[in-house]
Design a protein with these regions (language model features):
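Actinobacteria-biased recognition of intrinsically disordered, low-complexity terminal regions
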Residues: 1-8, 166
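Acetyl-CoA-dependent GNAT
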Residues: 9, 13-103, 116, 122, ...
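Structural preference for beta-strand elements that scaffold enzyme active sites
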Residues: 94, 130-132
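Conserved acetyl-CoA pyrophosphate-binding loop and the N-cap/start of the following alpha-helix
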Residues: 106, 110-118
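Conserved beta-strand-loop-alpha-helix junction that forms the acyl-donor binding cleft
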Residues: 107, 132-142, 159-165
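Short acidic/polar active-site loop segments enriched in Thr and Asp
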Residues: 129, 152
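Conserved active-site tyrosine of GNAT-family acetyltransferases
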Residues: 146, 151
Length: 166
């Protein structure tokens, strides 16, 4: 467990029950994000999402190299979740953030910021060199948070729709 602020947000491993609730919620959420970003059609997005998660987490919460945390608020109650995987980058191993979710009634209270600050301690404890992540282009709130935390863009994909020829 790592503390990160006087307001105290900590991370602890998710329980099996917390993992099951998280997985059931994240599959349709990820599908909706892929549809909103124009990558998938709505018709089969949930099934594609389910398949991606099955591929990424073949042993569920016990998949080697993956770490699933509950984000715990100052009152000791879970306020969200955080999933990282150990990943190889040129010359170093890093924590790749696959998901961070704060429960709707706990958003805009600094929990995500403090969870990432706590994650830095976990990353150091795991012997990893840094933190990498992906953020959807339409998620401007997350982009602002990551900039505040000192993340720098490494790749940017852009898209422009072109109307059909007349």
């Amino acid at each position: 467990m790592t503390t990160s602020s006087p307001r105290t947000t900590t991370l602890r491993p998710q329980t099996d029950a917390e993992y099951d609730v998280w997985l059931a919620a994240i599959i349709p959420t990820y599908a909706a994000d892929k549809v909103a970003s124009g990558v998938w059609s709505a018709d089969d997005a949930v099934e594609k999402s389910r398949q991606e998660y099955a591929t990424l987490l073949p042993q569920g919460r016990q998949t080697p190299g993956h770490h699933h945390y509950a984000i715990i608020g100052a009152d000791g109650q879970p306020v969200g979740s955080l999933w990282i995987a150990e990943a190889q980058r040129p010359g170093k191993r890093v924590a790749y953030v696959y998901d961070v979710t704060i429960a709707p009634d706990h958003r805009r209270q600094g929990h995500a910021l403090r969870a990432f600050q706590a994650l830095e301690g976990e990353v150091a404890r795991l012997g990893l060199a840094g933190i990498a992540l992906h953020v959807f282009g339409h998620n401007t709130a997350a982009q602002a948070l990551y900039a505040k935390l000192g993340f720098q863009p490494t790749n940017i994909n852009l898209y422009k729709a072109v109307p059909p020829a007349a």
